[in-house]
Amino acid sequence: MGEQPIFSTRAHVFQIDPNTKKNWVPTSKHAVTVSYFYDSTRNVYRIISLDGSKAIINSTITPNMTFTKTSQKFGQWADSRANTVYGLGFSSEHHLSKFAEKFQEFKEAARLAKEKSQEKMELTSTPSQESAGGDLQSPLTPESINGTDDERTPDVTQNSEPRAEPTQNALPFPHSAGDRTQALSHASSAISKHWEAELATLKGNNAKLTAALLESTANVKQWKQQLAAYQEEAERLHKRVTELECVSSQANAVHSHKTELNQTVQELEETLKVKEEEIERLKQEIDNARELQEQRDSLTQKLQEVEIRNKDLEGQLSDLEQRLEKSQNEQEAFRSNLKTLLEILDGKIFELTELRDNLAKLLECS
């Protein structure tokens, strides 16, 4: 459930005003992740963007789509199926160009796939069927976009690397104020970088999780509808069997028909059992997704606690810097006083030396 994104970037998302068809209406309050996905169920490629649990872009790429750069950091494309025009505002021209290149790459692959499908239709269809089958589109494949499966493997598995847990070992207490300041600064920076990386990974997993939840919910609804239809068909067949059993003049025909109907009912019951197992599996996946959501909330709480602790460490760092500056000023004053005292002492020693010499001369004269 839930394919990995082939390419992702961040941008502000807009849609054209459905009333005026001129003004842009923002659909996200801040920059969100916009990703290309391969839908293996329908064999198509999509552009999907989520704002929390809300899908603000769900556009299927077709050969007739065109991505237009309207400025250095803004581009747009029209989706006739969604009956709207999407706009993306990027942080730099480089990100816009990269997104446009990927769009053109998928569009070209869709066009080539369509041409191959039409060639096959011309070889296997009659002339009348050829004129009627010109608009058919062939589903896209991963190989037509990225060449081989090996080329796309790094993009799929890049988020599966294990994350390193933060170390909890206590730091040795420094002997001087400068060492304590440096130790606190390093500890604060390391903790902040770790949780920033953790939050970025968490956001990426949250986007994948939301997409999987949306797909699971849609599949559950579809299975429930099919289950209800199978149940109605089974009830109708049971009623038909009962009616046929009541007709005694057609006993042989009824028996044969009954056997066929019972076989059909048995097949339907087996199908229902398979669908029920599928629904249970989907429910289990939804429960797992909820557990991941709870883990995300727990990590978010830990991140907030670390941010509070980081602020406390910054306050302690500022206080230590002030104390260090005060200590340096006091040492400078002490050195100045000591220098003055040494100069006075040198003068006194010089005077005593002269006095000693004078006394010695007096003793020699006497």
UniProtKB/Swiss-Prot annotation:
Modification N-acetylglycine occurs at: 2
Region (Disordered): 114-189
Keywords, alphabetical: Acetylation, Cell projection, Coiled coil, Cytoplasm, Phosphoprotein, Synapse
GO CC aspect terms: apical part of cell; axon; costamere; cytoplasm; dendritic spine; glutamatergic synapse; membrane; neuron projection
Domain remarks in the Swiss-Prot or TrEMBL record: The WH1 domain interacts with the PPXXF motif in GRM1, GRM5, RYR1, RYR2, ITPR1, SHANK 1 and SHANK3. The coiled-Coil domain forms an antiparallel tetrameric arrangement.
Entry similarity comment: Belongs to the Homer family.
UniProt name for this protein: Homer protein homolog 1
Species of provenance: Mus musculus (Mouse)
Gene name as annotated: Homer1
